[in-house]
């Protein structure tokens, strides 16, 4: 008889979990990263890159296409012109121990951008998006710290580009 009770309890948990998923899905709740139905609606976007970062330009292009927009090199075809004015990453000490040894660092990534219609009308004045992470000083010295910074910088760049796409999607 106890085995039957465990099976029944397990079945009730599965049923409860399924009902919760159905209710949350029905009210529009989505996991982080879902587009939620908002898109760039096929807008043709030209990117003017003043940062010189190939990785950033690639990430922005992929995000535009992944958000329902289209990327173009030709300014004459574009609906919007997205200008990437600059990007910067910086590191600072976040915490130290009693002896003054660094325990944690804070890495920050900032992207300056603006958006205009192809005719020149400004849609978004120049502004900045920022993302940051705190990370423990890794064992292994400067090489390990640089490797960890590079890994986090890529994550922060992706986060800032995601925020940029969310901002652009609100303008359609």
Walk through the language-model features, giving the residues of each:
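N-terminal secretory signal peptides and thylakoid transit peptides that target proteins
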Residues: 1-19
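Short coil/turn motifs at beta-sheet boundaries
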Residues: 38-40, 75-77, 100-106
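C-terminal/domain-edge helix-coil "capping" segments
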Residues: 143-172
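Surface-exposed short loop/turn segments
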Residues: 83-128, 134-147
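Bacterial Sec signal peptide processing site at the extreme N-terminus
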Residues: 21-42
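N-terminal segment of the mature soluble domain
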Residues: 40-88
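Sec/Tat-exported extracytoplasmic proteins
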Residues: 64-68, 115-119, 163-172
């Amino acid at each position: 008889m106890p085995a039957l009770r465990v099976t029944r309890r397990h079945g009730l948990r599965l049923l409860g979990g399924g009902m919760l998923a159905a209710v949350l899905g029905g009210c529009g709740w989505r996991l982080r990263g879902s587009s939620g139905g908002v898109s760039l609606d096929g807008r043709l976007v030209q990117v003017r890159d003043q940062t010189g970062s190939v990785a950033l330009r690639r990430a922005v292009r992929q995000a535009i296409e992944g958000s329902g927009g289209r990327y173009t090199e030709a300014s004459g075809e574009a609906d919007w012109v997205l200008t990437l004015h600059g990007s910067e990453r910086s590191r600072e000490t976040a915490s130290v121990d009693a002896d003054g040894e660094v325990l944690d660092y804070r890495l920050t990534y900032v992207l300056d951008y603006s958006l205009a219609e192809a005719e020149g009308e400004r849609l978004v004045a120049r502004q900045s998006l920022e993302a940051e992470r705190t990370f423990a000083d890794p064992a292994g010295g400067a090489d390990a710290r640089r490797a960890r910074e590079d890994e986090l910088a890529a994550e922060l760049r992706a986060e800032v580009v995601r925020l940029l796409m969310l901002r652009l999607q609100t303008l359609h």
